[in-house]
Curated annotation (Swiss-Prot):
GO molecular function: ATP binding; metal ion binding; protein folding chaperone; protein-folding chaperone binding; unfolded protein binding
Protein name (database record): Co-chaperonin GroES
Function: Together with the chaperonin GroEL, plays an essential role in assisting protein folding. The GroEL-GroES system forms a nano-cage that allows encapsulation of the non-native substrate proteins and provides a physical environment optimized to promote and accelerate protein folding. GroES binds to the apical surface of the GroEL ring, thereby capping the opening of the GroEL channel.
Gene that encodes the chain: groES
Record's keyword annotation contains Chaperone: yes
Alphabetized PANTHER family for the sequence: 10 KDA HEAT SHOCK PROTEIN, CO-CHAPERONIN GROES
Length: 96
């Protein structure tokens, strides 16, 4: 299934988190935190400004980003995989 985000929305897939501690202990449950790094899968056309022009997004498909995992993050299952739909405002940085 193809999915295309609207406006300033971005679809990302969370990166896997290392489940071993520095001492070699396997972390499970609440001890294993979710990653806030993700790969950008799709981007909308941009934010519509008050004057009607569209401001393109700074992120592009394939970028690795660090995002704010909180209110406004929508999780969805697409073809059996969990993806997140977020606003570009929730992206804190692009990893280069």
């Amino acid at each position: 299934m193809a999915i295309r985000p609207l406006h300033d929305r971005v679809i990302i897939k969370r990166e896997e988190v290392e489940t071993l501690s520095a001492g070699g202990i396997v972390l499970t449950g609440s001890a294993a935190t979710k990653s806030t790094r993700a790969k950008v899968l799709a981007v909308g056309k941009g934010r519509v400004l008050e004057n009607g022009t569209v401001q393109p997004l700074d992120v592009k498909v394939g970028d690795t980003v660090i995002f704010n995992d909180g209110y406004g993050v929508k999780a969805e299952k697409i073809d059996g995989e969990e993806v997140l739909i977020i606003s570009e405002n929730d992206i804190l940085a692009i990893v280069e």
